[in-house]
Regions:
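Juxtamembrane regions of bacterial inner-membrane/periplasmic proteins
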Residues: 1-248
Length: 248
């Protein structure tokens, strides 16, 4: 396992597909933390008004079911950033470099291997929009992501993301995911468990460690390698954590 982690870490900088090799196509049941999504027309009407945008967003989520930002492990936050949006603190609503990297990767592969969506884009999509793949829907996503970045801090956006994203196995948000997979509160997760959860949003069904333990373990190892590459953990910590994972 240690050799596998070392190989992954050394190869990350030359592998543009490492951060997303499975397209996000899963459809899940209605979330307990996100209410029924607003009509597109209603969302459009509220884009340009700061107060109305925040009102529209807050009306779509159940804040009382959120895990507060300071109760979410730093290792999970770092795992999500390393995996989903490694330049999170360096860009606004859209990561032009990330989009360019994804375009080159997908063009070379002849298929969609990597997405260029930022955490802000994923958050507004999950709260407001459908999974429809059209230019109109993408423009809506971009406009909403800009409003999100203008009106919420990076910490607030990450809190929204972690409390509304789908983690598979019927679990929306980090609170449900921690309970479903590990039978504990998020604050009690160890490094390997944080890495496992951080790898799920890319393809929740495919990487579900309960239904697909082998694929889940591979994904966890990849996330640990990404975290080591970004300097969040050491290669030794990545190798050690890759050797164990306890589900509930």
């Amino acid at each position: 396992v240690k050799d596998t982690v070392s190989t992954l870490i050394s190869g990350m900088s030359s592998s543009p597909t490492a951060q997303g090799t499975v397209e996000k196509t899963e459809k899940a049941s209605p979330s307990t933390v996100v209410k029924e999504k607003a009509e597109a027309g209603t969302v459009r009407e509220k884009w340009d008004d700061v107060a109305h945008f925040k009102e529209a967003l807050e009306s779509r989520v159940h804040r009382e079911k959120f895990v507060p930002y300071d109760k979410i492990p730093d290792l999970l936050k770092k795992g999500i950033i390393a995996t989903e949006d490694r330049r999170y603190y360096d860009h606004g609503a859209v990561d032009i470099i990330g989009v360019g990297r994804a375009f080159i990767t997908n063009s070379m592969a002849g298929e969609t291997l990597e997405g260029g969506s930022t955490i802000a884009q994923q958050t507004v999509k999950n709260i407001f929009l459908s999974n429809e793949r059209t230019m109109t829907r993408k423009l809506e996503e971009l406009a909403l992501a800009v409003q999100l970045e203008r009106n919420y801090s990076k910490e607030e956006i990450l809190e929204l993301y972690l409390n509304t994203i789908y983690f598979g196995h019927g679990a929306y948000g980090v609170g449900e995911a921690s309970r479903v997979y590990f039978g504990k509160a998020p604050k009690d997760l160890d490094l390997s468990q944080c890495a496992m959860l951080a790898g799920l949003p890319q393809a929740p069904s495919a990487y579900d460690p309960i239904s697909h333990p082998q694929e889940g373990a591979k994904r966890m190892t990849t996330v640990l390698a990404l975290m080591a590459q970004e300097g969040y953990i050491t290669p030794e910590e990545a190798a050690k954590s890759a050797m164990h994972l306890w589900l509930k």
